[in-house]
A protein has these predicted regions:
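Short S/T/G/P-rich N-terminal loop/turn motif that feeds into the first structured element of a domain
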Residues: 1-53, 60-70, 93-97
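C-terminal structural segments of small proteins and small subunits
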Residues: 66-90
Length: 97
């Protein structure tokens, strides 16, 4: 079943760390089956606290989403995002069929 990884950016706290993340994160997509559906486009908050941005990535299934997230390439990039931004990231299964 299709799965989606959703990033919700609350705030960038260290621009230099985020530059490192932005340089390294694309390397983790190489050889992976994923499709960016939304990538820091215009965000309009309809309810709740406003966010700085959001990303939605589509994967064939939850296992592939975890394989990408847990990969050495993404983990190398992740350390910089964790130091450079306040984000929420989660995986959610799509609907069947």
């Amino acid at each position: 079943m299709t799965a989606y990884v959703v990033f919700v950016r609350n705030e960038v706290t260290d621009a230099e760390e985020m530059k490192q993340y932005q340089a390294k994160a694309p390397l983790a997509r190489e050889g992976r089956t994923l499709k960016p559906l939304a990538f820091y486009g215009a965000v309009e908050t309809l309810e709740g606290q406003a966010v700085e941005g959001a990303v939605i990535l589509e994967f064939p299934d939850v296992a592939e989403a975890h394989a990408w997230y847990d990969s050495p390439a993404y983990q190398d990039a992740l350390q910089h995002r964790l130091k450079g931004a306040d984000d929420r990231v989660f995986v959610i299964e799509g609907l069947p069929g």
